[in-house]
Amino acid sequence: MSSIELLIIAVGLSMDAFAVAICKGLSMKKMSYRNAVLTGCFFGGFQALMPLLGYLLGTQFKDYITSIDHWIAFGLLSLIGINMIKESKNTCEITDEDDTFSLKSLTVMAFATSIDALAIGVTFAFLQVNIIPAVTMIGITTFTFSFLGVKIGNLFGVKFQSKAEIVGGLILIGMGCKILFDHLGVISFVFDSLNKFN
């Protein structure tokens, strides 16, 4: 898997955290960069840790399902993407600012938004992805989007929340399709056919 593909997956995964971060930003009367950094660290940290755990889990079964690994990757990415699109209909639940940025609240929400990343880690094991650069990229990307989410939520409210989750879902579904089509030779067949016409 190329660095560009990993970045695309990282962006797709981070949209869930981005949407929640917007809600957190909405609860602030005044922008707090401390809270934005804290949110980014929690969300980015969990989002990096969960794929690593998923990868370690996936390596235990990799040898048994090599022949269908592309179907599993396609299925997991598509299901996560569809779920993100469904969740885009949920609206922000506004709570007190102190509660919103408490360690308990941040831990619970960071864990909840990173469960999908656990499944992504399993697909990384099947696709033999270099896991350390992958989780580093996911963590940094999620930190960035979470930080921006708090800022955007504080400035504009929930305007971008649902759109972010829809975009994230579509990205993950698209990557799942690409992995499947790559393995089935559909993409190379299309390019070969186009080259013949040229």
Curated annotation (Swiss-Prot):
It is a multi-pass membrane protein. The chain crosses the membrane at residues 3-23, 37-57, 65-85, 105-127, 131-153, 171-191. GO terms for molecular function: manganese ion transmembrane transporter activity. GO terms for cellular component: plasma membrane. InterPro entries: Mntp/YtaF, Put_MntP. Pfam families: Mntp (PF02659). It is found in: Cell membrane. Keywords: Cell membrane, Ion transport, Manganese, Membrane, Transmembrane, Transmembrane helix, Transport. HAMAP family: MntP_pump. Belongs to the MntP (TC 9.B.29) family. Probably functions as a manganese efflux pump. This is Putative manganese efflux pump MntP. The lineage of its organism: Bacteria, Bacillati, Bacillota, Clostridia, Eubacteriales.
